[in-house]
Amino acid sequence: ELNGYNHYEISNFSKKGYESRHNMSCWNQCQYFGFGAAAHSYRDITRYSNITDINEYIKNIQKGNLSKNRIIHEIQKESDTEKEYMLLGLRKIEGVKINDFKAKFVKNPIYLFRNELKKLSDENLIAVDANTIRLTPKGIDLANLVWEEFV
């Protein structure tokens, strides 16, 4: 916030319009696709990577065995996806927009995480209003304690 830099996520500052699109896509739980050996992807509720051996990767492509290149690491349960959305969203200084959560999961995060939010609010680590759940200045300094509630 000095010299025109904006504190837009827990560990980054930028000039307006120069925020990391990659990081923000991760914090917003957007899907991404990785191409090539050792590349990672996230689609719907599945995280996977491609095999790391470049020669094996190329051989599978040449033989038309593309599925042999993919390794599934995790298929998330909905409750895990909801918790992750909170954890990642709280990395952003703007926090989690309640209506965005409702649109994605058709649930109210204030009700769904009422116990966690009450505890964190009582400890002055988060602020909750009608539109947003976000870290307080104290919560920014102690963010790991906040995120632990959603792991």
What function would you assign to each model-found segment?
Residues 138-151:
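Short, amphipathic alpha-helical interaction segments positioned at domain boundaries
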Residues 121-131:
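A short, conserved structural fragment
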Residues 19-23, 123-124, 141:
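Short secondary-structure transition/capping segments
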